[in-house]
Amino acid sequence: MSLSTEAKAKILAEFGRGENDTGSTEVQVALLTAQINHLQDHFKEHIHDHHSRRGLLRMVSARRKLTAYLKRTDAERYTALIQKLGLRR
């Protein structure tokens, strides 16, 4: 259920600050969002997959914490990221 290498590279190129930026908050939130969207499609077919649903909830929680951190530290980057990813806030 993980993302392909090409998908990760595309996200890194779009949201990263530099060529090898894999740890910035924007990149982490974008990767989590892609994984969450992928899992949502999985759950449409596999309704009773509770083990993966727990992983999904952990990812959503991690994304929420990272976005809260970004909002607290740099509100401009936060609003730009939320608009770019199409998240509710």
Curated annotation (Swiss-Prot):
PROSITE patterns linked: RIBOSOMAL_S15
The entry's keywords:
Ribonucleoprotein, Ribosomal protein, RNA-binding, rRNA-binding
| GO terms for biological process, alphabetical | translation
Select a single GO molecular function from the record's annotations and give it. rRNA binding
Q: Which GO terms describe its cellular component?
A: cytosolic small ribosomal subunit
Q: Which SUPFAM superfamilies match?
A: S15/NS1 RNA-binding domain
Tell me which family the UniProt entry assigns to this protein: Belongs to the universal ribosomal protein uS15 family.
Function field: One of the primary rRNA binding proteins, it binds directly to 16S rRNA where it helps nucleate assembly of the platform of the 30S subunit by binding and bridging several RNA helices of the 16S rRNA. Forms an intersubunit bridge (bridge B4) with the 23S rRNA of the 50S subunit in the ribosome.
Quaternary structure and partners: Part of the 30S ribosomal subunit. Forms a bridge to the 50S subunit in the 70S ribosome, contacting the 23S rRNA.
NCBIfam families the UniProt entry points to: S15_bact
What protein am I looking at? Answer: Small ribosomal subunit protein uS15
Organism this protein belongs to = Shewanella sp. (strain W3-18-1)
Record gene name: rpsO
